[in-house]
Amino acid sequence: MLEPIIRQNAFGGKGEVTLRPLLTDEQKNEKIQMYAEVTIPEGASLGIHRHRGNAESYYILAGTDLYTDDGKTYEVHAGDTTYCADGHCHGLENTGDGDLKFMALIIPS
């Protein structure tokens, strides 16, 4: 298993975000920039950020959060999927009890 990456106040969010990459650099190719399980503790967030040259999708594994997509905010839960296209912005905040866990996939446009 690859070493987790811990980011503080990621993209201007609050608290810490832990990424657990699932693919090594050798396993990734020109079609995948990142594939990771992400954990955001209760009350923490991943700040709103814009994607340039790539797109990102989240599949929520556990928890409840507020997902912001181009200025509109939605509540998402385990089993939901989000998508942020190239040129658009998104972010999320863990508003539930316990950790928010999701799979994140970034692909080039």
Protein language model features and the residues they cover:
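A short, N-terminal "cap"/entry segment at the start of jelly-roll beta-barrel domains
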Residues: 1-33, 47
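Conserved short histidine dyad/triad with adjacent acidic residue
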Residues: 21-24, 36-51, 86
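Short, conserved beta-strand element in jelly-roll/cupin
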Residues: 37-41, 50-67
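A short hydrophobic beta-strand segment most commonly corresponding to one strand
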Residues: 38, 83, 97-109
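A generic "binding-loop/recognition-motif" signal
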Residues: 42-44, 53, 72, 88, ...
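Short beta-strand His + acidic residue motifs that chelate non-heme Fe in jelly-roll/DSBH
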Residues: 48, 67-68, 84, 90-97
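Cofactor-binding loop segments of dinucleotide-utilizing enzymes, especially the Rossmann-like FAD-
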Residues: 62, 70, 107
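Short acidic-glycine-tyrosine-enriched beta hairpin
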Residues: 71-86
